[in-house]
Amino acid sequence: MAFWETVLGKYIMTMAIAAVPVVELRGAIPAGIAAGLDPWLACGAAIFGNLLPVPFIILLVRQVFDRLRKHAFFAPKIDALERRAHLKGRLVRKYRLLGLMLFVAIPLPGTGAWTGALIAAFLNIRLRHALPAITLGLLIAGSLVTLMTLGIIHLLLSLIHIS
């Protein structure tokens, strides 16, 4: 049996997928469920995996961006990322931690822990304040994605039985 076929391997796979930007828990939860994990345990693994990069992003992204900006190749890309984070940060600027939690809680592309952490870093929200807000947002988003995934599975199964 290959490692990725074991229960531990499936949990690690779910956490690893959730740690990837853009995919995050929106892709990790359906992947974990498809791999045979209990839906709510897949949700928990995805939330944990999605949280892993958050402290590093909040604490280090500005220093990394400042160093990369010194290279002509990276400067325009860094500027574009910062502009995007500031544009998406309007809700967070207005409502601070509640806005950050709500921003992360919406399971749509362009929202989530990675963008929420970038926004927190650029708005100088301290890690000790941002991490609980992002965690609550991920709990909400994870629950929504899990329920939507289960609903889609149920719908597909009912369509198969109708045919």
Which residues make up each language-model segment?
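Hydrophobic transmembrane alpha-helix bundles
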Residues: 67, 79-86, 114, 129-141, ...
